[in-house]
Amino acid sequence: MRRRRVVTVKDVQLNTVRRGAGAPIVFIHGLGTSAATFDACATALAEHHLTVAVDLPGHGDSPSPEDTEAFTRDAALADLDVILESLDEPAVLVGHSLGGYLALAHAATRPGVVRGVVVLNTGPGFRDPDKREEWNARSRRNWHRFGVPERVAELNLQHDAVVMDRLADIATATLVLVGGDDRPEFSGAGNYLERKMPDARLVVLDGGGHSMHEDSHAAEIATLVADFVAGLH
């Protein structure tokens, strides 16, 4: 059964969509999308799990605060903290694209809080300042494509190398899913994560595009996530 619950963090309201019961799995979507992108995966997993899909600020049914500070990585991580603390037991984070970066950032800055992490078509950011600025410049050029206000799209910008610098220290079990037909930068990032993280496993899904969890590979991804969670200690 699908249940909607609003969580408030420092006057910021976050819509969450909850299904099922059991060991919790929290889903974090990418920029310009919403919790609905995980509907198929969450519905399948809700047979044995509590699934919680989050609308980030300014996305889906979560209002868009006027304060630009709501659209920073640290604010997003604080939002996740409140959602995770509302659960009865530690969760597994599943994040796509920007959501995957946030899941990695959470594991990097809050060791031991979550049971595991699953990332789909994402990367850990950039250590090279020039690469970061190149990413940020491209993000700014393409803001209009994401269908969100400029202040909301600020969430996609990179400002430091916190995640890159701490990859080797992330002891949290991590499943890295990459679409075989997504852009090469994501397959490169997936390989990098598997090499640098102490407990990461890479799976490449043939024919999968950037949003493969929404349609073509939803059932396969749900099975991979279920098996991953079942294997956690």
Please state what every model-predicted region is:
Residues 101-108, 113-143:
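Flexible "cap/lid" loop of the alpha/beta hydrolase fold
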Residues 43, 53-92, 219-223:
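Active-site loop/oxyanion-hole signature of alpha/beta-hydrolase fold enzymes
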Residues 172, 186-194:
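Short alpha-helix in the alpha/beta-hydrolase fold that links the catalytic acid
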Residues 181-185, 211:
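Acidic catalytic loop of the alpha/beta-hydrolase fold
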Residues 170, 176-178:
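Short beta-strand/loop motif that positions the catalytic acidic residue
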Residues 151-166:
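Active-site nucleophile elbow and catalytic-triad environment of alpha/beta-hydrolase enzymes
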Residues 12-63:
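Conserved HGGG/HGGXW glycine-rich cap/lid loop of the alpha/beta-hydrolase fold
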Residues 208-219:
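Catalytic histidine-centered segment of alpha/beta-hydrolase-like enzymes
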